[in-house]
Amino acid sequence: MKSLKIKKGDRVKVIAGNDKGAIGEVLSVDPARERVVVEGVNIRKHHRRDMPTPQGGTTKGGIISSEAPIHVSNVQLVTKIDGKDVVTRVGYRRVDVTKRRPDGSEYAAQRSVRYLKKEEAK
């Protein structure tokens, strides 16, 4: 399974497709299919019928709109710099951290940390 640089909660801009130029928050990520669901983008309508519930009632049917997944290559990360939305890329760097063992002793280790390249250039 491929590791994606886009994570849930990121602000992204759609760079291809019918919703090109739209900016929204990532609601979910599917790394196996390399797809992301972006808030307010790729809206699809689902026709649902009235369904009985186990409690004896019914859930109301109708036409329900929801976001459909889009391929991760069609989105790019967005960050706010000086109040403007700026598209950026993602980089990873190694950071020294101190970890603690269950017996209380500490040791030095490294952790990979994600950062936005445009924010780094500032």
Curated annotation (Swiss-Prot):
GO cellular component, one term: ribosome
Region (Disordered): 43-64
GO molecular function: rRNA binding; structural constituent of ribosome
GO biological process: translation
Coiled coil spans: none
InterPro entries (alphabetical): KOW, Rib_uL2_dom2, Ribosomal_uL24, Ribosomal_uL24_CS, Ribosomal_uL24_KOW, Translation_prot_SH3-like_sf
Keywords noted in UniProt: Ribonucleoprotein, Ribosomal protein, RNA-binding, rRNA-binding
Function: One of two assembly initiator proteins, it binds directly to the 5'-end of the 23S rRNA, where it nucleates assembly of the 50S subunit. One of the proteins that surrounds the polypeptide exit tunnel on the outside of the subunit.
Assembly notes: Part of the 50S ribosomal subunit.
Family affiliation: Belongs to the universal ribosomal protein uL24 family.
PANTHER family with a match to the protein in the record: MITOCHONDRIAL RIBOSOMAL PROTEIN L24 (PTHR12903)
NCBIfam families, per the entry: rplX_bact
Protein name (database record): Large ribosomal subunit protein uL24
